[in-house]
C-alpha cells in the first residue's frame, strides 16, 4: 500500500479513504486486495498516475512536477475499501445500485486546476447539458458558496438533498459571471444496469 487518502474523479466521484498500491498491476479492475492476514480489504477500481502523491507531498513542494518527471515511480492502482461495499453489497448484486435516496448528479466532467474548477465536458441529455453548461465554464460557486476543489464541490452538492433538487451554479464564462439553475437527477437514470435473470 503506497497511500490512503481521499480520491476525487472528474465524473462526480469521490471516495474518502481510498487505498493506493504500487507497482501498477495491469489486471486491476475488480481485483481483490488481500492483507497479510489473508482478508479482503479492497476491490480494484482504477489505474492512477499518483498512487504515491501523499508521500511525495511530504518530501517536496511541487508533487505534480515530480509525478510528471517520474511517472514510473508513482503509477499504481486505486482500490475501494471493502468496508464501503459491505453495507450495500446485497443491493448491488440484486439491483445494481444501493437502495435509498440517490445523490444529486449533474452529468458534467470537471477538472481541478490551480484552485479553479473547469468544466471539461457534459454528458448529452444530462442535467448540465439541459441547463446549457458548456465545456470551458469555470465553476465559481454552488448555491452561493465558493468552491475551489472537486472535494468541496461534491460535498456541497451532495449535502443539499437527494437527486431531483435544483442547484444554482455560479459560472465564469467568456469574462462574465453567470448563474445557471440545474435540476439534478440520479446518475443511475443515465446508466444501463445489469438486468437480473
Language-model features: where?
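Short, compositionally biased
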Residues: 1-7, 56-59, 153-163
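Chymotrypsin/trypsin-fold serine protease catalytic domain
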Residues: 1-14, 78
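C-terminal cap/linker of serine protease catalytic domains
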Residues: 5, 18, 36, 40-113, ...
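Short, solvent-exposed secondary-structure boundary/capping segments
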Residues: 8-20, 30, 191-195
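PDZ/PDZ-like domain segments forming the peptide/carboxylate-binding groove
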Residues: 23-27, 31-32, 106-141, 145-148
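Residue-level recognition of oxygen-bearing side chains
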Residues: 39, 127, 152
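Short, Lys/Arg- and Gly-enriched loop/turn segments at beta-strand edges
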Residues: 51-53, 146-153
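PDZ-domain C-terminal substructure recognizer with occasional recognition of PDZ-binding tails
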Residues: 90-97, 118, 131-134, 140-142, ...
Amino acid at each position: 500500500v503506497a497511500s490512503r487518502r481521499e480520491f476525487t474523479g472528474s465524473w462526480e466521484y469521490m471516495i474518502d479513504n481510498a487505498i493506493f498500491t504500487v507497482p501498477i498491476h495491469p489486471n486491476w479492475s475488480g481485483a481483490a486486495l488481500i492483507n497479510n492476514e489473508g482478508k479482503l480489504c479492497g476491490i480494484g477500481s482504477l489505474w492512477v498516475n499518483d498512487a504515491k502523491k501523499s508521500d511525495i507531498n511530504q518530501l517536496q513542494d511541487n508533487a505534480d512536477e515530480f509525478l510528471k518527471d517520474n511517472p514510473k515511480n508513482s503509477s499504481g492502482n486505486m482500490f475501494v475499501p471493502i468496508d464501503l461495499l459491505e453495507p450495500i453489497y446485497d443491493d448491488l448484486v440484486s439491483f445494481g445500485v444501493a437502495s435509498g435516496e440517490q445523490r444529486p448528479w449533474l452529468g458534467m466532467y470537471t477538472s481541478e486546476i490551480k484552485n479553479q474548477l473547469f468544466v471539461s465536458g457534459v454528458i448529452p441529455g444530462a442535467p448540465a447539458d439541459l441547463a446549457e453548461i458548456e465545456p470551458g465554464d469555470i465553476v465559481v460557486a454552488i448555491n452561493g458558496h465558493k468552491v475551489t476543489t472537486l472535494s468541496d464541490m461534491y460535498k456541497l452538492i451532495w449535502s443539499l438533498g437527494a437527486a431531483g433538487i435544483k442547484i444554482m451554479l455560479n459560472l465564469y464564462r467568456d469574462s462574465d459571471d453567470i448563474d445557471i439553475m440545474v435540476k439534478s437527477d440520479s446518475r443511475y437514470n443515465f446508466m444501463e444496469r445489469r438486468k437480473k435473470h
